[in-house]
Amino acid sequence: MFESKNQDNKQDNLSCILSCLNQCDRVTIPEKKWYRARVINEDDADIVYDGMGNPLRGYLSDKSGVAPAKYISSGRANDRYEQVLYIAEDEETAQKEARADEGRYVSVASCNFQNDMVLMDFSPYTEEQLSDYANTNFSDSQLNTYMFTQIQKILTMPEYSEKEYIISRTLVKCIKENMDVSGILYISHFTGKKNMAIWDDNKFIKFTDGCLKLA
């Protein structure tokens, strides 16, 4: 998936990755308000438009969550048509992560989690946080510390094309297949705030109606 420090073969790389993942923190979703942004598609049947073709409102609550499979392109943690829900800890981060072209409309909704969904935590971000995390989780292995920082970089990189997401999707597939978690917690390159990607039971998460924003 990515080169190890000693250039071992892919199987050894996978073993190193799994060793690191097994020592990463599992966390439940903090019970606070989280935000979801969806770029509004042209001629979307779920949107009301004015006579000039501009949307009059955002998506209603039942459409503010994970998008229909037909609208989903490959992303950081999902293949094309795969319904992974991306949300952020504040409105600004949600909008930036949606990466809407200038002049496009975005619908921003919020939700409050009250469940025991478990995520793998890649969010320690500052030098002090990373040092504390490494000393606690990886005190027996400098290699695992190195692997964690590489995984975190892959999940945070501000990639834009579907093709460039191959590495992060391969990593997330490894997590899905080998770790008993429902998603990941990671850092936004744009704001340094937390994002979540949730692949289990994401259609049952309730959102507010979306507010209309212009990118």
Please describe what each predicted stretch is:
Residues 79-87:
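A short, exposed loop/beta-hairpin motif centered on an aromatic-Gly-Thr core
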Residues 91-102:
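Short active-site loop/helix that positions an aromatic residue
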